């Protein structure tokens, strides 16, 4: 995970935005992601996200609407006030059907401009 993306998420959280992850991940890969990829800055996953919703814990996979509904219910988020970012069009289609604002970054795209944090703002 590029450091600027980790910092982008952390900056939004510091600004008072609620940040969540919804991931189709399994229990074998998750420890590596949590303990290696998210600790580059000496921080933990919880420093970036209020909560990580993980498919293997929720027993659902994106793009099933049910995993989104469970996340909405558990978090209290309002889809109409939430930006959902994903690199899979099917996942975004479901999110949009449920009322989320959506964005699909291009491969290697620096999308900090969405948050006025970087190049292209």
Regions found by a protein language model. Name each.
Residues 1-20, 65, 108:
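Short, acidic loop-to-helix structural element flanking the phosphoryl-transfer center
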Residues 23:
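Conserved phosphate-coupling serine/threonine residues in phosphotransfer and NTP-handling enzymes
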Residues 26-27, 33-121:
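Asp-based, Mg2+/Mn2+-dependent phosphohydrolase catalytic module
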